[in-house]
Amino acid sequence: MSKQPNILLITTDQQRYDTIAAMGYDYMYTPNLDRLVREGCSFPNAYSPNPVCMAARHNIITGLPARYHGFDDNYFDDNPKVIPYDLPTFPQLLSDAGYDTIAVGKMHFQPYRRHNGITKLELMDEIPRHRQDDEYALYLKEHGYGDIQSIHGVRHLLYMLPQRSMLPEELHGSSWVSHRSIHHIKENAGKRPFFLWSSFIAPHPPFDVPDQWADLYKGKELPPLKVSTTPLSALAEENKNIADYPTEAYLRRARELYFASISFVDYNIGKILQRLEDMGEYDNTLIIFTSDHGEMLGDYGTYQKFLPYDSSARVPLIVRYPEVFKGGEVDRRFVDLNDILPTVLDAAGVAYPNPAILPGESVLKKSGFKDRTKQYVEHAHGSRRWASIRNGQYKYTYYYGGGKEELFDMINDPDETTNLLAAQETCECLRQSFPSESVSAVREELHAALVEQEKRYGLEGYVKNDELVVLDEMQPFFYRENNPPMFPKEQDEDFVSLEEEVRRAIAKEEVVKLSELDVPYFTKSGTLSEKKLKK
């Protein structure tokens, strides 16, 4: 490449590591991501450094952990937390260097429309509070669908349950991201270099795929669920409440729709790649594909994210850059989302003001200062906080609430079914296979390594006298996604009722029966009428 490359960052939300056919998961249909694998470099040991939406996305744009940017978890509108204004973001650094910086889709910034150096920002939020702040919501109104409030699927009552999109395929959020991305590629091709962030909400729940894609995985063999043989953490036990599946058939169908959602995103990614080719910019573009975190999807009976297990914390990562990668390369070193900022700046030839503080390093380099033999992940604060570290064979997690610990053998037990520290006390066969002194030695080695990572990159106050602190045990609470539509009534007097949206969303999903759902729980807030729902 003789000129500064364009940069295309494609992100999905909540996509597990094991969802791309060409990376070894042949139950998936992902022809366009498979193409990127063939033409670039895939990273099968990629992790989210904090597996929850807002935290991970702030790591991406700053290249730094929550210790610096402040977002250790998801925060909401009533929390005044913001990135420090003197903290560089890579879109701002690219903009300062002459790039046109564009973002389309879900950002999950706070404040909502903070640009972070992005000069053209077109938002599609999961739960837009005001239509005028959300370009996608305005787009739907312009195209005759302004009466629908649950534009990304019905979250209230049906959050993790099987459902369909109430929109035609061409107006679905995933289609809109590709449509607007294609527009900006056409507008910018041949001019100054551009950075484009195409950010899909899918496959984040609700799994509201269009009708044409809904049966792609119906009846097909899917990977078995992971099952734990030892007790789970309090955080994982709390997590089990997020989904309410009356029967196994509901979960099976939800998994089918999750995978279909990914295939639909893949289809739209193909459109974006094709436009780059048509404009002659494909080989002059650094393309990065990844996700902010994974999805438990029923493994160990848990759902969503924010857990240290690979289903939640491990993500797909593919980089296409012909100047460095010949195609079909596989880099099995540990990488994470903190590496995106230095990778982007490396390709663009842009310096970071204070590189010594960055935990990440460009993946375009085959070697460097970063120790890629270990991977550190963190999440949250207080008694809900945990931190994890793994090497080539073992993963160790420390839960600050009560000082609980987990240790998994990732070679012999890649599904993380048996916590060696718990199993030693109960299983004679494990005591023979893993003598207590061996388990203890591994635990001590990784515990010491985690202390060093927490001292350097973790939130302040969690290491005292070179030891991880012990806090009061976490108090689990019963949690269900309780998100009725939020558009103020004055925005539109002709909204479809929530009850009608529920009926439309499940009309073609035979497995879902209203009589089997926990409707009373969702009527307590007064936003859903059981009588109207069942009329």
Q: What function would you assign to each model-found segment?
A:
Residues 2-7, 112-131, 167, 173-228, ...:
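Active-site regions of oxyanion-processing enzymes, predominantly non-cytosolic
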Residues 59-167:
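Catalytic-site neighborhoods of secreted/periplasmic enzymes
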Residues 28, 206-212, 274-326, 336:
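Histidine-centered active-site microenvironments of extracellular/periplasmic hydrolases
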Residues 30-31, 60, 106, 111-115, ...:
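Polar, surface-exposed loop/tail segments
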Residues 128-132, 293-299, 338-341, 346-415, ...:
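C-terminal cap/loop subdomain of S1 sulfatases and analogous C-terminal strand-loop tails that border
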Residues 3, 26-29, 48-52, 78-87, ...:
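A short beta-strand-to-alpha-helix junction
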Residues 1-5, 16, 42, 243-250, ...:
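Long, internal low-complexity/basic segments
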Residues 1-41, 50, 95, 211, ...:
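Active-site-proximal N-terminal segment of extracellular/periplasmic enzymes that hydrolyze or transfer
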